[in-house]
A protein has these predicted regions:
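Active-site and adjacent substrate-binding regions of carbohydrate-active enzymes
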Residues: 1-206
């Protein structure tokens, strides 16, 4: 309902010429906009239609997230793994889905209001990070995250133009180059993450 106090917890836009507000695409395929007949508007979902994106520009949304995080911190958890953290600063009207201009402002605020004064590990998932971007997250002086994990090494065996489940033999020299680059670039500004795969990728041993 447009009258719900939670309406602005999500991202809604009016149709344009009877269709989607713009051409943003879902990571699962198709449009990132889903039409809601009851309200006559579209809501944004970069993943499943059952996972509408939160409106991080709404300070009440951010405070709700921080309250949930502090609940678990008080329970004694050891840290947080933040899925696609680079997308919380999205600006859909400008066709920006990742690395938006307020991204690091939000993460710094999160740090100050939740885990910043605790001995916790925080790791953010970033599909588009370069070493320089990674340091924006993990530089201790910036008070954001402990580290990120990125996917440059894990995508070396992918075949251009084919789904990620189709792979080619891994270039070992290329792998060494990527791992060395990240290890060197983050030497004094954060931790590098070493992993082969996750639930979004084919198994390296298959």
């Amino acid at each position: 309902s447009k009258d719900s106090k939670y309406r602005d917890y999500y991202i809604w836009r009016d149709p344009i010429d009877g269709s989607e507000p713009n051409s943003l695409e879902s990571c699962f395929g198709g449009s990132a906009w889903q039409y809601d007949e009851q309200s006559g508007q579209y809501y944004l979902h970069f993943f499943s239609q059952k996972q509408p994106d939160l409106n991080w520009e709404n300070p009440e949304v951010r405070e709700e997230v921080y309250d949930m995080m502090n609940f678990w911190i008080d329970k004694g958890i050891g840290g947080f793994r933040m899925d696609v953290i680079e997308m919380i600063g999205k600006q859909p009207d400008k066709m920006i889905s990742s690395n938006g201009p307020k991204l690091h402002e939000y993460i710094n605020e999160m740090n100050q209001k939740t885990f910043g004064n605790h001995d916790l590990l925080t790791v953010g998932e970033t599909w588009g990070a370069t070493p320089d971007i990674a340091k924006l997250y993990s530089d201790p002086e910036r008070n954001e995250l402990s580290m990120i994990f990125q996917f440059e090494a894990t995508t070396l065996d992918q075949i251009d133009g084919k789904p990620k489940w189709f792979t080619k033999p891994l270039d070992v020299l290329g792998l060494k180059h990527v791992l060395s680059k990240w290890q060197t670039c983050l030497e004094d500004k954060g931790w590098n993450s070493l992993f082969w795969n996750n639930h979004d990728l084919p198994r390296a041993v298959s």
